[in-house]
């Protein structure tokens, strides 16, 4: 008999039902569960798949460059970044006739196009690209990298090139390679690009391979570096009247600490950015050389962790046993990596708008909104994934003997205290925040808005003042002109920073009031509840009072059969599943808050946010309803407009989102009955009954149906908000 799918599991391949297909897809990437898997093959498979991932990323970014070069308007955008709308790519086949063609022909294009809200134009412009030829060259280079990655992936699956397990578990060498080799060297290389290409480009000098060796990035060359007069590289920076991309008002400095923003582009000074990357490179190059590799010098990670025993005794045996636990568990390592990446992605969202690095991106409001929202959602999914793999670690990889009385074991020992504290925090935040909102709603409903409970966020305002914001009148730290902090920075970065933080047209340290106080606590509620569900799922993954042998059932199980009531919905997977809803909920509040506050800031009517954000009806009426008018008007009796596609996506997103509930509410029995009825009808219908299947149709398991429901809910939720965000912002600001 021919090998049936899935080849990695003979047990599943012989299953006579459609379960074979669905379980096969579900476990395709769970290499640990495959037949004949060894630890060595597991590591090699994962390692090789990383190269495939890199190849896809390079191919995708190459496609971005290629399509903009081919169908975009990069060269005309470069001439006037503030008024030309950047084109992402052409629309091949515009449906709905002539009105659609006219509606989508914009940005100086000859036919229908999509506008780019990704910020790539601003990024490419800032790093020194100027022509379509530059874009094509970049696309070809990335295509080359993509094919190299694919080749490397294939190569590392060949017997001669397969690394051994000991190579994968050599933690110090991996740290050396990642910290120094990847982060350190790439940061240094990026500094080099900024200094040699981007900064001259911002001063109107076009540096390419043909003149790269002739153009000195700094008039004094490498002299100051070798004589130790590094401060010369910071002298004569660009002036405040500098026109980006030209020599008008340009200086000669390459590494500065000016602080604040370039007045024309409203983005960080490129010379400050180069300085930052050089510092990062230095730190990582040093960090990567601190651990003992082939030369017998430096720290051993194992020795470090074994020595970490707090003397007070309150943390037991401290970090003893952690080295082997982490180094032998791929899930623990993945959990750590995802947690770090999730935090970084959220930080990227926060910093991209408050400290924009790319020229003119701060004035492209739709792009700012899209990038913030995109990065926050990505961060949410990555963070929940971190806890999922943390739970899988506890089920598959945790060894109690190896971790006796260390910090990991102690987390499990006092999990009741952790979970109940999180529960208490969530309840406190939820009841008090909702109570304040609802009280304010009632006061407005009865026509007595002056009876609202409005709380000034004085602690947050004090923190903003400490960073130099003067409008609140706190005379503290950087907002006090006679303190040591103020005097220390006055000659370098401080004037630029103070100018930026007290300027009302950017997004740096926005003025906050009672509406911000309330939504801050609503978001805190969402964060604590999401954390509660995820932490409980991981800490109870091995077992609980209700089900002490839970770890024997694996990561996801629906229920444990008759006679053990209450064991439904308590697998670690169920906790992850529930937490994703709360994560989406929380990021909804975060993005609503960000978007509404910024819309009013950009339109110059900040009072709308300040007055309406203190009660729920204000959010529903003055943010959601008021800003969805563009979507509801996307097509009307007078034909189409350029927002029609978003109006359609808004409806379609709602549809996908609502479909999720169908899977979330009706469970396995319903689908099984439905499928059997459909199969019966199929077999008795002429022509249709000529098509037969080998597998007996079986409904999805409860766990799978929940996954399908969750996927529809998440995708629909994000599609709906993406359409709302882009249409309402671009409808106002073009």
Swiss-Prot record:
Oligomeric form and interacting partners: The PsaA/B heterodimer binds the P700 chlorophyll special pair and subsequent electron acceptors. PSI consists of a core antenna complex that captures photons, and an electron transfer chain that converts photonic excitation into a charge separation. The eukaryotic PSI reaction center is composed of at least 11 subunits.
Enzyme class: oxidoreductase
Binding site for phylloquinone: 671
Functional note: PsaA and PsaB bind P700, the primary electron donor of photosystem I (PSI), as well as the electron acceptors A0, A1 and FX. PSI is a plastocyanin-ferredoxin oxidoreductase, converting photonic excitation into a charge separation, which transfers an electron from the donor P700 chlorophyll pair to the spectroscopically characterized acceptors A0, A1, FX, FA and FB in turn. Oxidized P700 is reduced on the lumenal side of the thylakoid membrane by plastocyanin.
Annotated NCBIfam families: psaB (TIGR01336)
GO cellular component, one term: chloroplast thylakoid membrane
Entry binding sites for chlorophyll a B3: 662, 670
Catalytic activity: reduced [plastocyanin] + hnu + oxidized [2Fe-2S]-[ferredoxin] = oxidized [plastocyanin] + reduced [2Fe-2S]-[ferredoxin]
Coiled coil ranges: none
Enzyme Commission code: 1.97.1.12
Membrane-protein topology: Multi-pass membrane protein
Signal peptide: none
Residue intervals passing through the bilayer: 46-69, 135-158, 175-199, 273-291, 330-353, 369-395, 417-439, 517-535, 575-596, 643-665, 707-727
Family the UniProt entry places it in: Belongs to the PsaA/PsaB family.
GO annotation terms (biological process): photosynthesis
Name the record gives this protein: Photosystem I P700 chlorophyll a apoprotein A2
Cofactor note: P700 is a chlorophyll a/chlorophyll a' dimer, A0 is one or more chlorophyll a, A1 is one or both phylloquinones and FX is a shared 4Fe-4S iron-sulfur center.
PANTHER family: OUTER MEMBRANE PROTEIN, OMPA-RELATED, PHOTOSYSTEM I P700 CHLOROPHYLL A APOPROTEIN A1-RELATED
Alphabetical UniProt keywords: 4Fe-4S, Chlorophyll, Chloroplast, Chromophore, Electron transport, Iron, Iron-sulfur, Magnesium, Membrane, Metal-binding, Oxidoreductase, Photosynthesis, Photosystem I, Plastid, Thylakoid, Transmembrane, Transmembrane helix, Transport
PROSITE patterns membership: PHOTOSYSTEM_I_PSAAB (PS00419)
Positions bound to [4Fe-4S] cluster: 559, 568
Pfam families with a match to the protein in the record: PsaA_PsaB
InterPro entries: PSI_PsaA/B, PSI_PsaA/B_CS, PSI_PsaA/B_sf, PSI_PsaB
A GO MF label: 4 iron, 4 sulfur cluster binding
Location in or out of the cell: Plastid, Chloroplast thylakoid membrane
Chief site of localization: plastid
